[in-house]
């Protein structure tokens, strides 16, 4: 419907009331391969993610894309919720833990490791450049061992 793109954008931006309104008007929350839940997860909008899950989105779509992007962007509560709903933390060759590590999201790394003892990460750290022209953190993963 005409509302499908709008519900994806509202989910991406965390506008739960707008998402609810669009759903009431017939928006397809599963449009474009469940893009709404993926973008809500990527941007840390837990309330939107929960609402979409209740309505029946597939959090495991696109090889567990939702948990991978939530981990990459450091949204621990979203990661925990997705795990509670059956997300696969080892999807795409352990993308979630590897990219959480590379981006300095230690809490997510610790959480994911606590769920699967076969994942071992050593020497994860984040360094900020002292050069004024660099505003983004530079992250380094020196060693990851996944059985």
UniProtKB/Swiss-Prot annotation:
ANK repeats lie at residues 2-31, 32-61, 62-91, 93-121. It comes from the Viruses. The keyword Repeat applies. Keywords: ANK repeat, Repeat. SUPFAM superfamilies: Ankyrin repeat. It holds the Pfam family Ank. This is Putative ankyrin repeat protein R847. It comes from Acanthamoeba polyphaga mimivirus (APMV). The lineage of its organism: Viruses, Varidnaviria, Bamfordvirae, Nucleocytoviricota, Megaviricetes.
């Amino acid at each position: 419907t005409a509302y499908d793109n709008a519900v994806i954008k509202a989910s991406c931006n965390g506008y739960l009331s707008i998402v609810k309104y669009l759903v009431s008007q017939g928006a397809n929350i599963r449009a474009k391969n469940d893009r709404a839940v993926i973008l809500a997860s990527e941007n840390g909008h837990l309330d939107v993610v929960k609402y979409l899950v209740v309505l029946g989105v597939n959090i495991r779509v696109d090889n567990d894309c939702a948990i991978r992007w939530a981990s990459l962007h450091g949204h621990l509560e979203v990661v925990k919720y997705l795990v509670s709903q059956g997300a696969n933390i080892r999807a795409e060759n352990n993308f979630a833990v590897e990219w959480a590590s590379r981006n300095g999201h230690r809490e997510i790394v610790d959480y994911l490791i606590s769920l699967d003892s076969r994942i071992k990460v050593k020497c994860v750290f984040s360094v900020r450049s002292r050069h004024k022209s660099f505003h983004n953190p530079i992250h380094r993963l020196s060693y990851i061992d996944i059985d």
